[in-house]
């Protein structure tokens, strides 16, 4: 797959297919021996998308051609998505516990937090994503008879367009503190769009707002294109027949911690390995997982 500046997608193509992949990993992570997340909507959503490989994956029908490496790669990807999901789950529940009642999930994909987290009374959750993605998930959740646990407001727009105006038009209150998530998103944006995303978040945020994201510091000399190919190769060994390479935008990026700090955010950052330790999952130490310690989970507070 090759990206363009104005490309769009549904949940069976391009970047949208990775949202389905992540949902499939959440479904598997929710059914392990000692799950650290619980997403009962992940598997039904994956089945509804209809991509054959991911449907078979959540139904236990995938047999990797190389069982040893394929199963290992699948476990690594599943555990990695599990700790990432738990990090963002804890971020939102912590912000709500501390009194924040307005939340925005950017590039929401098949995220079901508005339905599955324990939101307090008065909580409003905004989900922002491509129109086809929003329409599909809204219709599918209705067909599943799922009810949001917070007041859910969907915003159908590409994040490369004027999404702040669309957010305000849907009732977003710039005077209230907000909890923001940009999960699994930054590598799918051109470098300048990443900066613009954080500028827009900052402009929309009242003091006390919080932000959670993750990024890949360029500390290993590995380009985004190389990381995308490694990502694709791991899934290919599992048996995935969908080309997931070519989806990341290359180019020199701002250091997320430095960029946010320079705009008034108090930032903390932790490597992915620490999250494995926090949530009691074993982290595999070898050359094939070299990029994972370089993934950094970021949380920040404004003002």
From Swiss-Prot:
Keyword set includes Metal-binding: no
One Pfam family of this chain: LCM
One of the record's GO molecular function terms: methyltransferase activity
Keyword hit for rRNA-binding: no
Keywords for this protein: Methyltransferase, S-adenosyl-L-methionine, Transferase
InterPro entries reported in the protein's UniProt record: Ppm1/Ppm2/Tcmp, SAM-dependent_MTases_sf, SAM_mthyl_Trfase_ML2640-like
UniProt EC number: 2.1.1.-
Tree of life domain: Bacteria
Matching SUPFAM superfamilies: S-adenosyl-L-methionine-dependent methyltransferases
Chain positions recorded as S-adenosyl-L-methionine binding sites: 129, 158-159
GO biological process assignments: methylation
Assigned protein family: Belongs to the UPF0677 family.
Record-linked NCBIfam families: mthyl_TIGR00027 (TIGR00027)
General function of this protein: Exhibits S-adenosyl-L-methionine-dependent methyltransferase activity.
Record protein name field: Putative S-adenosyl-L-methionine-dependent methyltransferase MAP_4197c
Taxonomic lineage from the root: Bacteria, Bacillati, Actinomycetota, Actinomycetes, Mycobacteriales
